C-alpha cells in the first residue's frame, strides 16, 4: 500500500468517531487503577514422577546440543528446568503411550502438565535436520493439550500463543500447540481476560482466517505493526525487541481490531 501509519493515526484518518472512542478506551485503561490485596501463592513444582524419565538439562555438558539450542534461542536460564532431553525419542514416546511407533532420534523435550501438575503429554523438538521439527505426544488421546496450565494465574490477563517456546517470553502465557486450536481456548477459559498472539504471518491464509474469527467473536488480539517483520515472538526476542511492550501497545478488539487487521493484511 506504500503508506505506513500506527493504529492511532490510521483510525484518526479513516474514522474520527471511532478514533475518539478508542482513545477514550485506552485512556481509561491506563488511568483507572483498582487497588486490591494480592495473596502470593507458592508455585507448585511439576510432578516429574508422573512423566517418563529423561535426562535433565542441568545434567548435560555445557557444549551439549540441547544446551546450545537453548542458548541460541535466548531462552532464560531460569526456564531451562522446563525442558528435558532424550537421544532415544522412539523409546520415550512408547513410555508416554505404548501405541506410538517413532524413530530413535534425539530431541529436546518440552513436558506438558495439567493444572494439577500432572504430566499429560510432551512436545519433542528435533536437534538435527529431521522432519517434522516438532512432534507432540499425548498420554491419553482423548485429552486436549495446552502448555503452561500448571504455571497459570487465572486472576491475571492470559496471553495465548501457538508454541511453548514463545510462551516463555510472556508473563502468564499458555500455548495452544497448533494454530487450529486457538478457536477452542475460550471454551476452557470462559471468564478470563485473554489476549491472542498469533504468528506475524499476514500472507498465511490459515492465520488470517483464525484472526478474523477471533475478532468477529470480540476477542482481544495482537496485530503487529507494519515495521515488525519477524514471524514469531522468539524471532523478535532474537532481534532484541521488547515483545511485551509491543504486544500490549498493539492489542485490539471490536471495530478497532478489524481496522488494524485489514491494514495489517494489506501492507505486508
Which residues make up each language-model segment?
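Short acidic alpha-helix initiation/capping motifs at coil-to-helix transition points
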Residues: 2-3, 58-64, 224-225
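Short glycine-/small-residue-rich flexible loop motifs, especially phosphate/cofactor-binding loops
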Residues: 8, 67, 71-72, 77, ...
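Phosphate-handling DNA/RNA-contact segment within nucleic-acid enzymes
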Residues: 90-193, 207
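TOPRIM fold recognition
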Residues: 4, 132, 155-158, 164-268
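TOPRIM metal-binding catalytic domain and adjacent DNA-binding surface shared by DnaG-type primases
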Residues: 14-108, 116, 217, 249-268
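Beta-hairpin (beta-strand-turn-beta-strand) motif
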Residues: 1, 113-115, 199-201
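Short metal-binding segments enriched for Cys and/or His
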Residues: 1-16
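Alpha-helix initiation and N-capping motif
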Residues: 4-8, 21, 63, 67, ...
Amino acid at each position: 500500500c506504500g503508506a505506513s501509519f500506527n493504529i492511532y493515526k490510521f483510525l484518526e484518518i479513516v474514522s474520527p468517531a471511532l478514533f475518539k472512542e478508542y482513545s477514550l478506551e485506552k485512556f481509561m485503561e491506563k488511568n483507572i487503577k483498582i487497588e486490591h490485596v494480592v495473596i502470593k501463592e507458592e508455585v507448585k513444582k511439576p510432578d516429574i514422577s508422573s512423566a517418563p524419565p529423561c535426562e535433565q538439562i542441568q545434567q548435560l555438558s555445557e557444549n551439549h546440543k540441547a544446551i546450545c539450542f537453548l542458548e541460541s534461542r535466548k531462552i532464560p536460564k531460569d526456564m531451562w528446568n522446563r525442558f528435558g532431553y532424550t537421544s532415544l525419542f522412539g523409546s520415550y514416546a512408547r513410555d508416554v503411550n505404548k501405541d506410538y511407533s517413532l524413530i530413535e532420534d534425539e530431541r529436546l523435550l518440552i513436558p506438558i502438565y495439567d493444572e494439577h501438575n500432572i504430566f499429560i503429554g510432551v512436545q519433542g523438538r528435533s536437534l538435527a535436520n529431521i522432519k517434522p521439527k516438532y512432534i507432540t505426544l499425548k498420554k491419553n488421546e482423548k485429552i486436549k493439550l495446552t502448555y503452561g496450565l500448571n504455571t497459570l494465574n487465572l486472576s491475571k490477563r492470559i496471553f495465548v500463543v501457538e508454541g511453548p517456546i514463545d510462551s516463555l517470553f510472556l508473563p502468564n502465557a499458555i500455548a495452544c500447540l497448533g494454530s487450529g486450536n486457538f478457536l477452542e481456548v475460550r471454551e476452557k477459559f470462559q471468564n478470563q481476560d485473554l489476549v491472542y498472539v498469533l504468528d506475524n504471518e499476514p500472507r498465511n491464509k490459515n492465520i488470517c482466517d483464525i484472526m478474523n474469527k477471533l475478532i468477529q467473536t470480540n476477542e482481544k488480539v495482537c496485530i503487529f505493526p507494519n515495521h515488525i517483520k519477524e514471524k514469531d515472538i522468539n524471532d523478535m526476542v532474537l532481534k532484541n525487541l521488547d515483545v511485551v511492550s509491543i504486544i500490549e501497545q498493539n492489542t485490539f478488539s471490536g471495530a478497532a481490531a478489524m481496522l488494524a487487521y485489514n491494514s495489517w493484511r494489506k501492507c505486508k
